[in-house]
């Protein structure tokens, strides 16, 4: 799966052609702080490139501001609920404003870990076995069927918020209760022991895979955004055939959900070398710790080129 840089950069040569661009960031989700950092970096890059851009920290007056500002397109860099789950995409569709990233359905699906897994499983794509937790009895049944260790996840949060690895029933019940603070729907998955990879897509192409290493139990919020000892390996260390398999699996996983524009898939590899899909992010982080800019650099794109490529692939709103 060879990259074509000319195709990635198509439509980025004239920054003025984008018109007036609103960078949407912040919001009210648990990932607000990450979104503020991502939005600041995206806005700074667009302005430096000569794009007529301005930022909006998304609040209740958003629709009024979009109308008053007479914007030509929106760069969505909201993370989590209210921005990455299809609701913002639906608002922009209704307003007739083109926007970056995936559409309403793909955004909603990818934000919902349970339904993402169901789509993948229906197509025979590999993803860890799981259970839905709504009670202590569910925890007991999941423990009996899946065994330990397990990982508990809120179904609709990103940035590893509310996630925990557990090794016994008491830990599982406590982790379920903690995750339920963030989401009424909680999943528990079989723990896959082995290296974790992340693979970004941009304008229909798959960027170089990155292998993640952390002294933390898993690649959690601190490892993603705060730690200085997280290791990123690119090239990822897989042989050519295995990396091709990983990239092809990522492409199939994203296609199954209808991902467009850009995104990032997280994948585990077990001791037998098999890959397991975890989730897809439709508006990944764009901070100095973020993975999509890192993958883009490995492909030969600097941060500004990446931002312009994402913007150039804005989805036309049907209105």
Curated annotation (Swiss-Prot):
GO terms for biological process: cell wall organization; peptidoglycan biosynthetic process; regulation of cell shape. GO terms for molecular function: ATP binding; D-alanine-D-alanine ligase activity; metal ion binding. HAMAP family: Dala_Dala_lig. Disulfide bonds: none annotated. Its cofactor is Mg(2+); Mn(2+). It is an enzyme of class 6 (ligase). It is found in: Cytoplasm. It catalyses: 2 D-alanine + ATP = D-alanyl-D-alanine + ADP + phosphate + H(+). Residues 117-312 form the ATP-grasp domain. Binds 2 magnesium or manganese ions per subunit. InterPro entries: ATP-grasp, ATP_grasp_subdomain_1, D-Ala_lig_Van_CS, D_ala_D_ala, Dala_Dala_lig_C, Dala_Dala_lig_N, PreATP-grasp_dom_sf. The keyword Manganese applies. PANTHER family: D-ALANINE--D-ALANINE LIGASE (PTHR23132), D-ALANINE--D-ALANINE LIGASE B (PTHR23132:SF23). Cell wall formation. Pfam families: Dala_Dala_lig_C, Dala_Dala_lig_N. Mg(2+) 1 binds at residues 266, 279. NCBIfam families: D_ala_D_alaTIGR, PRK01372.1. One of its GO terms (cellular component) is cytosol. ATP binds at residues 143-198. Keywords: ATP-binding, Cell shape, Cell wall biogenesis/degradation, Cytoplasm, Ligase, Magnesium, Manganese, Metal-binding, Nucleotide-binding, Peptidoglycan synthesis. Its EC number is 6.3.2.4. The keyword Nucleotide-binding applies. Coiled coil: none annotated. Pathway: Cell wall biogenesis; peptidoglycan biosynthesis. Belongs to the D-alanine--D-alanine ligase family. This is D-alanine--D-alanine ligase B.
